[in-house]
Amino acid sequence: MTKPILYLDMDGVVVDFPETIEEIDQSIRVECREWCEKNSKHHSDFEGLFATLKPMKGAIEAIEKLREDFEILLLSSAPWNNIESWSHKRRWVGKYLPQLGKKRLILSHRKDLNRGDYLVDDRSRNGAIEFGNYEGQEWINFGSDHYPNWESVVAHLKNSLR
């Protein structure tokens, strides 16, 4: 039997992505703030940011539980002007999720073009809502009232198998 395909967004879902500069790792905070002030860009475009980020609470454990029943791929977007973040995301996966195996990372600004069963994403952008509009596909809005944490997502996905 083929396992259902489960796409996981990285930023804010698997990776604890900072919403503000104050939440950025102390080792690069000052440099990032100065860069943002000079370039009037968002901190997500700052080169080197992604390499300092840690996993979201409960994410690694949840992925381990879900691997038994789902074909898991990471489906993330990356800042277009921060090419370094693309390779940093790949390195992050190798560091924190080696158990997923190779070639499990897809970078796209059109998540709705991918076919699968589930997409866990904290934002509605980049085709997340549209992904859920296709028959047999579901967008799970991570961090929402229905799915506030990994525990609720795992429970929902495991129940969907019944």
Predicted regions and their residues:
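Short catalytic/ligand-binding loop motif for oxyanion handling, primarily in non-cytosolic enzymes
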Residues: 15-17, 23, 74, 81-85, ...
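Active-site neighborhood of HAD-like aspartate-dependent phosphohydrolases
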Residues: 1-47, 148
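Conserved Lys-Pro-Asp/Glu-containing loop-to-beta segment of HAD-superfamily phosphomonoesterases
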Residues: 5, 103-131
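Active-site donor-binding segments of glycosyltransferases and PAPS-dependent sulfotransferases
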Residues: 83-111
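Acidic, Mg2+-coordinating phosphoryl-transfer loop and its flanking beta/alpha structural elements
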Residues: 118-158
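Substrate-recognition element of Asp-dependent hydrolases with the DxDx(T/V) motif
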Residues: 54, 59-87, 93
